[in-house]
């Protein structure tokens, strides 16, 4: 029997067709699977340039239905603030762009309308700085400003400017500021001499102008330092000091008058104890020749009686009223008798 031997390199048609169909079918299947995978996972068309996107539409609707197609994200959004649309045509701009242009124009016009100084490096006195920083007479800023500059948080704050101006003024004249503060302190605490009762109102530091030196305004013709005007009222209110001043002027000579006498506070001179001692003592030459400092010493001794009423003293601390006390600090010289709190608590126990 003759057997059929196919020639090598030339396969039969049945086997060749079946193998070719197998490879072609598998190749189409792999292409379909890869394209389907790319439609769901590829982020952009650039990821697979060789194969175009195939959109799978599962709906049975018309082919014109674009519900499954994605939106075109490459189109520029006209309402976006970052991108500005530039029209190629010669038509007018939209109203929003016109409003933006007019706003910029109004801002530039307002810059031109403001009165800036021609010489910015001009020397400005510190005293005129408060007038420059103070607000206008109307107290309102003109409404011609654009809405951005009309915002309240961006407006100039005049109080802050005035604080800075006052701080600069204090730095420029520290000596004058210190003298004025000391004069206000002496108003409250010190009593004037007799010659100050005839001083006019111009001697008060409040009436002195800024250009007038303060020392020349408070010194009299004889070179004596005059007291401020606030303490003159204390002399008018206290009759005791006026009577003692008249007595001392009649008896004592100004040349023999001691120069280092302690000034009496007007607050203490109007106290009840000082007037009671003056009324109770007889009008003798010895009482007239006493200086205010000696009256102050006696008054300290009598005022210590009511010291426990004025101060909040613990009941466990007590002292004898017969003991002497120092007139300067009003503190008892003798050691205080202090009860031990432990003993008090032991006595309170039942």
UniProtKB/Swiss-Prot annotation:
<dbReference type="GO" id="GO:0005634">
    <property type="term" value="C:nucleus"/>
</dbReference>
<feature type="region of interest" description="Disordered">
    <location>
        <begin position="237"/>
        <end position="266"/>
    </location>
</feature>
<dbReference type="GO" id="GO:0035861">
    <property type="term" value="C:site of double-strand break"/>
</dbReference>
<feature type="region of interest" description="Disordered">
    <location>
        <begin position="1"/>
        <end position="21"/>
    </location>
</feature>
<feature type="compositionally biased region" description="Polar residues">
    <location>
        <begin position="246"/>
        <end position="259"/>
    </location>
</feature>
<protein>
    <recommendedName>
        <fullName>Uncharacterized protein C16C6.04</fullName>
    </recommendedName>
</protein>
<feature type="compositionally biased region" description="Basic residues">
    <location>
        <begin position="287"/>
        <end position="298"/>
    </location>
</feature>
<feature type="compositionally biased region" description="Polar residues">
    <location>
        <begin position="10"/>
        <end position="21"/>
    </location>
</feature>
<feature type="region of interest" description="Disordered">
    <location>
        <begin position="278"/>
        <end position="298"/>
    </location>
</feature>
<keyword id="KW-0539">Nucleus</keyword>
């Amino acid at each position: 029997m003759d057997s059929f031997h196919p020639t090598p390199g030339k396969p039969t048609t049945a086997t060749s067709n079946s193998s070719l169909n197998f490879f072609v079918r598998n190749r189409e299947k792999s292409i379909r699977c890869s394209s389907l995978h790319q439609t769901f996972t590829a982020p952009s068309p650039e990821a697979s340039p060789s194969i175009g996107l195939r959109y799978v539409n599962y709906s049975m609707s018309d082919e014109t239905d674009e519900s499954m197609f994605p939106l075109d994200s490459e189109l520029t959004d006209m309402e976006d603030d970052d991108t500005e649309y530039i029209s190629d045509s010669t038509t007018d701009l939209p109203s929003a762009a016109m409003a933006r242009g007019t706003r910029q124009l109004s801002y530039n016009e307002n810059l031109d309308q403001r009165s800036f100084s021609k010489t910015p490096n001009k020397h400005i006195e510190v005293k005129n700085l408060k007038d420059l920083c103070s607000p206008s007479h109307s107290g309102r800023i003109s409404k011609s400003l654009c809405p951005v500059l009309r915002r309240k948080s961006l407006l100039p704050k005049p109080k802050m400017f005035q604080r800075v101006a006052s701080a600069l003024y204090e730095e420029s004249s520290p000596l004058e500021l210190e003298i004025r503060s000391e004069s206000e302190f002496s108003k409250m605490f010190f009593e004037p001499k007799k010659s100050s009762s005839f001083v006019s109102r111009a001697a008060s530091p409040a009436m002195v102008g800024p250009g007038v030196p303060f020392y020349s305004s408070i010194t009299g013709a004889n070179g004596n330092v005059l007291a401020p005007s606030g303490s003159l009222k204390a002399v008018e209110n206290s009759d005791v000091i006026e009577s003692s001043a008249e007595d001392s002027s009649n008896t004592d000579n100004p040349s023999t008058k001691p120069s280092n006498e302690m000034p009496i506070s007007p607050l203490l001179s109007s106290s009840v104890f000082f007037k009671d001692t003056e009324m109770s003592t007889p009008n003798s030459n010895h009482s007239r020749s006493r200086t205010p400092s000696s009256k102050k010493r006696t008054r300290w001794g009598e005022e210590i009686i009511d010291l426990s009423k004025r101060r909040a003293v613990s009941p466990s601390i007590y002292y004898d009223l017969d003991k002497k006390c120092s007139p300067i600090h009003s503190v008892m010289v003798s050691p205080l008798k202090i009860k031990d709190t432990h003993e008090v608590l032991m006595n309170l126990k039942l």
